[in-house]
Amino acid sequence: MLVGVAGNSNTWGIKMHRIVIVGGGAGGLELATQLGRKLGRSGRAKVTLVDARMTHLWKPLLHEVASGALDAAESELNYLAQASWNHFQFQLGRMTGLDQKSRKIELAPLYDEEGNVIAPRRSISYDTLVISVGSGTNDFGTPGAADHCLFLDDPDAAIAFQKRLLSEYMGAQARGKSETLEVAIVGAGATGVELAAELRDAARQFSAYGLDKISPENLKITLIEAGPRVLPALPERVSLPVAERLVHEGVRVMCGSAVTLVDEEGLQLANGIKVAARLKVWAAGIRAPVFLASLGNLKTNRINQLEVSETLQTTQDPNIFAFGDCAACPNGHSGTNVPPRAQAAHQQAHFLALAIARRIEGRPLPSFTYRDYGSLVSLSREGAVGTLMGNLMGSFKVEGWLARMFYISLYRMHQRSLFGTRRVVARMLADALGRSTEPRLKLH
């Protein structure tokens, strides 16, 4: 399934440089859009984006989809439409192999909902390959985790959780008696904390809309963290007040508690405590897709991230770049890697849009420099909390409505890179009108 001008030559008969981007997450889609505008429109390159889904949803929104605070269908962006608007091509498929010698990637067959093959195994040729397939949750091999926990790695998983949550409330209402629902969240990083806060707000909304047989007090949320505190990536002056706020909101916070076993009834902790839970979410740790570890001679680390240099080229093949969560990129001379954050992928996409244009022109590539602008964590409609980095003031804490505005602006920045300022303003107005005529929680 392709959109755009077919073939490898432009209207002047000059062979175009073939750029293939695998993965349409925040970074991959931003890069395809920028390269399409910069190189695809002028016929200097043929830009192709490959993804296993037809639509894009900004991953930091998944906890809102899971709670029902956001309808995924209203926030998804169709890759075909974005490709048509921005002079690149889209091909639906899942990457399964790589032939470095002939410069081709292999895609798995496509199937319809009945299991019929609608497209056979295919290959796509490239001159420059960019891999941006993101990461998934790392269950660290914990027995039972894969069978009994949900992982908020994609919109389908978030929607599945939302449906199960709604079913619990609808079932209790139909039975007509007061019930208790236990939810356990493993991992108190940003995703775990944000989901806990959203679920606490969702409990109040369910009751307001008449689903009151599971009262807000009877939605028992347990947040489990193996480390000593919540939000370990943020300073203690930020994370400790967040933990206090969660406890005040009725969330049970258990730090220093490693999960050793998950079963249908709940989770077993290393300290011998058993946490009962009907709904279980694993949000601890990340790892890149397993297939990356078997791609040609490319080197990966222990969590399957492709090892890249400061130019974001893989260490074994200069024709292949990788960025975002799936890449282990050195962070200057710090001895650490660039953190797996949305802001890093955004910066790397902008860097690669310029670097790949230089590569086509035969010019040397610059080195990527990551700039940490701070971290923000949403606490649902109660606001947000986090740190911002300034050149003069260093790191400083923000919270409440101001932090919430900064948090929302991150999403608007992502939208602006995809649509431009005027269309983002139009979307903001449409969102505001929608909030005045729709329920605050998805109830279907």
Regions found by a protein language model. Give the residues of each.
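A Rossmann-like FAD-binding core segment of flavoenzymes
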Residues: R44-K46, N86, F90-P109, R200-E310, ...
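FAD-site-proximal beta/loop scaffold in flavoenzymes
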Residues: H148-G176, E265-Q268, K274-Q347, L354
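Rossmann-like dinucleotide-binding core of oxidoreductases
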Residues: E179-L234, P241, R252-M254, V338-I356, ...
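Beta1-alpha1 glycine-rich phosphate/pyrophosphate-binding loop at the start
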Residues: G13-G97, A190-L234, V281
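FAD-binding core/adjacent interface of flavoenzyme oxidoreductases
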Residues: N8-K15, F90-A184, V281
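Short glycine-enriched, charge-decorated loop/helix-capping segments at active-site entrances
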Residues: L62-G68, A146-L150, V238, G296-K299, ...
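C-terminal, flexible cofactor-proximal segment of oxidoreductases
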Residues: M16, A353-H444
